[in-house]
């Protein structure tokens, strides 16, 4: 599989071939993904919740994102690597936003993702001007859950719906190469997808986007809580628990280690 680029994303929009994205936060997971046909790996700030144990993503730092991006990049996957810009790494001013985006690229990402709508237009333009591809993110933006009044579906009112449409158009104009739409009503995501020339990526926004993204812990059945819009394709939590319990039993009953697991000195 050859390296996926942002041009491939745009092409898939025109050919109506769905784009597939999963999060990954470490080398072994990225190595497994590298042997699949997945289009893109998102090193998401969701690592704060599913890896570091925080209640939300607000405590994730640039140091965290750089470290995990490096780990994923060391697997040398052909998938497009997109790294999230964490909370307060791009909102303060465009100069620091460009610098932090550059640090993620130096860590191995092929593009960055940031949250927000039209208010991020100048920031997106500055990062793109610096030569760094940007993926946008609208709808439920987890870094802004306090302002949104919690984790909820966005677009219930006409005002919210109109703002989502405006945000998507402004971000496209600013130069994003694709747009994540999270936890909005399905008809809104469909409208946005039809209006934009860039690909849209849904998470909890229905089937009409140009692609889908999931947190890999949800897909593998590892999460403590799985959102209604996610699907678990396997229950690894149960498989891992069973393996650990079997190991305990084997050790206590002298069934591990067996002869093939150690060496004896020849007499």
Swiss-Prot record:
Primary location recorded for the protein, binned into one broad class: cytoplasm
Manner of cofactor binding, per the entry note: Binds 1 Mg(2+) ion per subunit.
EC number: 2.1.2.11
Keyword Cytoplasm listed: yes
Top-rank EC class of the record's enzyme: transferase
Cofactors (names): Mg(2+)
CDD domains, per the entry: KPHMT-like
Residues that bind Mg(2+): 45, 84, 115
InterPro entries: Pantoate_hydroxy_MeTrfase (IPR003700), Pyrv/PenolPyrv_kinase-like_dom (IPR015813), Pyrv_kinase-like_dom_sf (IPR040442)
Cellular compartment(s): Cytoplasm
One of the Pfam families matching this protein, by short name: Pantoate_transf
GO MF entries: 3-methyl-2-oxobutanoate hydroxymethyltransferase activity; magnesium ion binding
Record bears the keyword Magnesium: yes
Active site: 182
GO CC term, one of those recorded: cytoplasm
GO biological process, alphabetically ordered: coenzyme A biosynthetic process; pantothenate biosynthetic process
Coiled-coil portions: none
Family: Belongs to the PanB family.
PANTHER family, per the entry: 3-METHYL-2-OXOBUTANOATE HYDROXYMETHYLTRANSFERASE (PTHR20881:SF0)
Subunit (UniProt): Homodecamer; pentamer of dimers.
Protein name, per record: 3-methyl-2-oxobutanoate hydroxymethyltransferase
Lineage of source species: Archaea, Thermoproteota, Thermoprotei, Sulfolobales, Sulfolobaceae
Gene: panB
């Amino acid at each position: 599989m050859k390296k996926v680029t942002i041009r491939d994303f745009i092409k898939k929009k025109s050919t109506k071939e769905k784009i597939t994205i999963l999060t990954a936060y470490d080398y072994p997971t990225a190595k497994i993904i590298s042997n699949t046909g997945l289009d893109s790996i998102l090193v998401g700030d969701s690592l704060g919740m599913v890896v570091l144990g925080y209640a939300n993503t607000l405590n994730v730092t640039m140091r965290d994102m750089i470290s995990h991006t490096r780990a994923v990049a060391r697997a040398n996957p052909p998938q497009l690597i997109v790294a999230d810009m964490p909370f307060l790494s791009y909102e303060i001013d465009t100069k620091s936003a460009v610098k932090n985006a550059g640090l993620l690229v130096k860590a191995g990402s092929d593009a960055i993702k940031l949250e927000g709508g039209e208010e991020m237009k100048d920031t997106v333009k500055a990062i793109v001007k610096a030569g760094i591809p940007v993926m946008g993110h609208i709808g439920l933006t987890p870094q802004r859950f306090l302002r949104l009044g919690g984790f909820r579906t966005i677009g219930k009112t006409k005002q919210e719906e109109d703002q989502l449409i405006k945000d998507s158009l402004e971000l496209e104009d600013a130069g994003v190469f694709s747009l994540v739409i999270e936890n909005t009503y399905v008809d809104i995501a469909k409208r946005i997808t039809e209006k934009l020339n860039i690909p849209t990526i849904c998470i909890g926004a229905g089937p009409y986007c140009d692609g889908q993204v999931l947190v890999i812990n949800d897909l593998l059945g590892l999460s403590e809580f799985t959102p209604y819009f996610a699907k678990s394709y396997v229950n690894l939590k149960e498989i891992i628990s069973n393996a650990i319990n079997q190991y305990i039993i084997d050790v206590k009953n002298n069934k591990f280690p067996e002869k093939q697991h150690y060496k004896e000195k020849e007499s």
